[in-house]
Amino acid sequence: MTDEQQTPEEYGADSIKVLKGLEAVRKRPGMYIGDTDDGSGLHHMVYEVVDNGIDEALAGHADAVNVKIHDDGSISVSDNGRGIPVGIHEGEGVSAAEVIMTQLHAGGKFDSNSYKVSGGLHGVGVSVVNALSDYLELRIWRNGKEHYARFEGGFTVKHLEVVADCGDRTGTEVRFLASLDTFSNRDFYFETLEKRLRELAFLNSGVRIILTDERPAEHLVSELYYDGGVKEFVKYLDRSKTSILPEPIYVIGERDEIVVEVAMWWNDSYNEMVLPFTNNIPQRDGGTHMAGFRAALTRTINNYAQSSGIAKKEKISFTGDDAREGLTCVLSVKVPDPKFSSQTKDKLVSSEVRPAVENIMNEKLSEWFEENPQIARIVVSKIVEAAHAREAARKARDLTRRKTAMDVNFLAGKLKDCSEKDPSKTEVFLVEGDSAGGSAQTGRDRQTQAILPLKGKILNVERARFDRMLGSQEIGNLVMALGTGIGRDEFNIDKLRYHKIVIMTDADVDGAHIRTLLLTFFFRQMPQLIERGHLYIAQPPLYKVSRGKSEVYLKDQAAMNDYLTEQGVEGAMLRQGNGEEIGGADLRRVVDEAGRLKRVLDAFPTHYPRHILEQAAIAGAFVSGAVEADLQGVADKVAARLDLIANEWERGWQGRITQDKGIRLARILRGVEEVRTLDGPMMRSGEARKSGTFTQHLQDVYNTPATLIRKDRVQNIYGPLDLLKAVLEEGERGLSLQRYKGLGEMNPSQLWETTLDPDARTLLQVKVDDVAEADDLFTKLMGDVVEPRREFIQQNALNVENLDF
């Protein structure tokens, strides 16, 4: 341990202020870290640690953060900042680092000399990460020494000590394994972490963040570094849209220690996206910074339109909605002592932020318009179009309000309503086509279920202005049926007539297209329905299976496989090489285990043949520890297993160790050498580790060839994939299989039994976890620009299964 001398302004041990108590964290973790079941709290653990590194960058002491998901499920975060103070904390009698790790509300962010602004303190700090982890290892590089400490369950098990010299290196590394006592699972999602880390890289220009996932055989690495900051962020958000400006408008300024940074870019769409951040923390519900931005934007554009004569020429006034149509904006403020409406920090309520944002925006944006008159006119012209469209939409809406009794009767002829008037007890099915609508109308529960047939494909609202959308008959019928109205000023979710809105389309390409059109409509025009959990997608069955007089409906391929397995196991017996027989429920368990192994093997890169991976798993090639002890012995066993399953003239496999501690398998076949290699990194990957957990079971069942006996049929079984294939083939014998492509193929009673009956059906609730990513996806799929859509299809084509309709 090193004693430290510090000046009053220095970041040292005495900078750490303490507010005690950790037991409450373990008792009610959700209050401190978020939901412990849906994954958000688990990933928030990582963000807490990452934010400490980012705060070092904000203070000017770091420029690199590394996040690594290790193959054992733990995660490490390191930075090249100053390193957590290691001196003895005067008030606590232990190192400052241990105080930070074991005391709630302990850290340098309470001390204004250490950090002027910080985003990492979500009311908790890294001590909560420690409290909710099986173990946490801390390494600190400071004062030329490497320090190490270990904690378990939030308690110190190895006090901070010097373990090595480190030269000039400085920084901190935290590695932790989340506790299964707190979290229902501890599987980190690479994409979820990448999204948040990308935001941080954009918001902190010049900071390099590297995310590595060591779990797959081929490690995933994402390097996130953006010199352009929020300007690059806006370009990234608009990557699938067509901008009307050559470059984003960029504004930066400071007032009363509040730093305001804004990037704005208008595109040719009709949708607004403004992402507000305070000290790198996103505000889903906006706040005072958003209010200041909107007020300044509307005022500045109106002033420019007046002074340039555009407003007088066009004879129309602009609103804030007009100014923000097609706008993509990132608004980032750095505030010394921000105040939020809740622990989740979803809304900024610091009153001093609004005038700061408003003044900086007014001044800087006015200057920009004066200095760039040609581009300013492009922006104002776009806003003029929006204002004219708004006026046209108002007139169209007035016409809608003046609907006569005949119009309402026309809707009644389309909508087959239910008798229940309590919206919380009712549901409306949006059904593709009149024929399916007829079956649904006859088969439904008339008390609580309404049916609205949709004729043809509804309007693609991604490519249509609001006034044109209001002129669409199908959309008009839908809006009238729901009862909420439409548009920012008219929509009222309290008037929703059905609390379950169920999209029910065919299982073919047209059905998928109609479903996507409807999802686009709800996402763009009625997002509150998705946010409140009112939107669902029906899951009509994909198959009807008949055997004799019995009929079974199966909703998807997984249900089909389960059914075929049950049928194939019935009356079957697996006779092992030692003469023992497995049947009934025991055989079903063996087959299910084979299915689980197949899913693990399918996660390996496709260039590894599945039968070789299967035999390697049986031979024990993926068992941790055993492989390192006798790798050549394992290689010989794998070669012997491959000879076992080969025809006599195709044998001769030989195994040897490769330089990267993998296995090279080779044989001479018809004078040509065939080589297969199990790479060392692959054999130590997360997939290999999972495969190794099956080895004992595999050796118990498949160590010698077995036979599957069913009635008078006998099949040789050399491994779990053989068994799975044989059982599914047995299950298919004597079955008549019908694959439904349209709802109209089912009669009313079938539709009720499979899709409408609340006690038997399956519904998928529509949720949006990432608004920006969802916006980009809808733009790609439904927008005017072809190239991003082509790229999306090319990138995802290989992931499509069952493309047979």
Question: What do these predicted regions represent?
Answer:
Residues 1-805:
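Conserved phosphate-chemistry cores used by DNA topoisomerases
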